[in-house]
């Protein structure tokens, strides 16, 4: 009698557990708008109620089988849980470089929310948890490209706002060489740079400034083909040319300084949107030419937030990235500083678009209109280099220009184009030391990963061990860093 009562009570508990799990799972399916997941419901029912499948058969075994399978069971459960949490809710991200200093610092560990902008349904769902694209140690792909799902984003708490700090997939990371030494390099910049050098050596270099847009296009196509053919012919040096799907490209973090539909222009380092100056971040940095009368004191460097990387740049090139506060302190220190002035060196090379001469520099750039979903733009040979990558690569169209300068999209002559996606303009706060949209262009909406919420850990690479912990940054909300 007692056993029957216990059994009956146990079934009530199991039914209650099943009801809770089923309710949560159905709410999840409603959120992601995918009823394909209903095929899992019978298995959930079996786990709690019918128990036809002996899910934990290994518990009946003895010896090493039981021991090994208990660890396998725990590991598989943990990996699956991490996979879904990272995919739909949040993930960890560590700041690898100084491009956002002094707002976010190298060694800051971020809690990145996926629900802020809405998580993406994975493009490549079959991937090893806790990896981005490569298995550690064995150096092979950590994902399978089939099945491949089209871009779709689940409804989130909001949209990307102006001046948000955003984590996204590197747009120019669709193509790269698989030799490890060069994987961090921008493939397209590398191709154009090599092509330009080879054409100089062969006496084929020309002054593009005097060319028409069509002549420029033909010339840069030749530069690109020369560089790509050279890389392809040197597999021992560069390895194979490979591609990566959107969600397997490297994660970057920058500040959004331009929204879809806005016209962006940089004039004397200040970002203007639709003709109005956008507020600079409080800790924005620029590089300064500096001449010292002696060695830079370490305690002063720590006080001003100047890192070993900053000092190394100064020792190698005579320029150093500084916030306005640090600049004013050093300018007033006549005993240490002989001269200091902002670095206004014009840098024309490697700026986006790579296949046209614009005369733009990192401090004086544009204007460019940022594409907005559903809005159209008239296409000309002059503006085509700015929007060609959006049309061809990000939105999957076939685009060609004939010898008469006529533009064809998917085989039909086109004088305008209507965009299918929203795009953003991302820049680092370390303005003279950041690879950002000025170098590789727009960030499509399908590349947006998430929004950093707070810094859960921070450790300076300049100070080993306990002394490197930045206690004042722990659990700092990123939204409070303006």
Tell where the protein language model's regions lie, with residue ranges:
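Extended hydrophobic leader/signal-anchor segments used for secretion and membrane insertion
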Residues: 1-482
């Amino acid at each position: 009698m007692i056993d029957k009562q216990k059994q009956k009570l146990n079934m009530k508990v199991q039914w209650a557990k099943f009801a809770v799990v089923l309710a949560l799972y159905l709410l999840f399916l409603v959120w992601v708008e995918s009823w394909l997941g209903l095929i899992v419901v019978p298995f959930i029912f079996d786990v709690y109620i019918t128990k036809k499948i002996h899910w934990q058969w290994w518990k009946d075994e003895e010896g090493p089988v039981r021991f090994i399978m208990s660890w396998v069971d725990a590991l598989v459960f943990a990996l699956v849980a991490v996979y879904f949490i990272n995919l739909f809710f949040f993930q960890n991200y560590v700041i690898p470089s100084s491009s956002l200093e002094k707002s976010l610092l190298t060694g800051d560990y971020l809690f990145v929310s996926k629900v802020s902008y809405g998580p993406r349904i994975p493009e490549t769902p079959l991937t090893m948890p806790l990896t981005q694209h490569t298995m550690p140690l064995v150096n092979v792909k950590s994902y399978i490209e089939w099945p491949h799902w089209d871009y779709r984003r689940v409804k989130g708490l909001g949209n990307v706002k102006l001046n948000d700090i955003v984590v996204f997939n590197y747009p120019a990371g669709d193509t790269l060489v698989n030799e490890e030494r060069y994987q961090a390099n921008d493939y397209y910049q590398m191709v154009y740079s090599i092509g330009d050098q080879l054409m100089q050596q062969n006496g084929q270099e020309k002054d593009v400034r005097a060319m028409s847009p069509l002549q420029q296009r033909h010339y840069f196509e030749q530069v690109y083909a020369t560089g790509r053919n050279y890389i392809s012919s040197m597999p021992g040096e560069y390895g194979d040319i490979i591609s990566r799907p959107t969600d397997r490209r490297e994660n970057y973090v920058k500040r959004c300084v331009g929204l879809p539909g806005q016209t962006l222009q940089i004039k004397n380092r200040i970002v203007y949107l639709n003709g109005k100056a956008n507020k600079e971040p409080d800790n924005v940095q620029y590089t300064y030419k500096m001449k010292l009368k002696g060695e830079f004191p370490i305690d002063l460097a720590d006080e001003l937030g100047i890192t070993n990387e900053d000092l190394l740049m100064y020792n190698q090139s005579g320029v150093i990235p500084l916030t306005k506060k640090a600049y004013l302190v050093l300018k007033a220190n006549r005993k240490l500083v002989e001269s200091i002035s902002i670095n206004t060196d014009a840098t024309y090379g490697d700026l986006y678009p790579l296949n046209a001469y614009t005369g733009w520099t990192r401090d004086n750039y544009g204007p460019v209109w940022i594409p907005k979903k559903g809005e159209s733009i008239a296409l000309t040979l002059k503006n085509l280099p700015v929007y060609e990558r959006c049309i061809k690569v990000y939105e999957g169209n076939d685009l060609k220009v004939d010898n008469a300068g006529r533009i064809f999209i998917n085989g039909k002559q086109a004088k305008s184009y209507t965009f299918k996606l929203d795009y953003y303009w991302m820049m680092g706060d370390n303005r003279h030391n950041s690879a950002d949209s000025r170098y590789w262009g727009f960030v499509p909406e399908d590349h947006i990963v998430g929004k950093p919420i707070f810094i859960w850990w921070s450790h300076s690479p300049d100070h080993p061990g306990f002394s490197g912990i930045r206690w004042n940054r722990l659990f700092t909300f990123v939204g409070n860093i303006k």
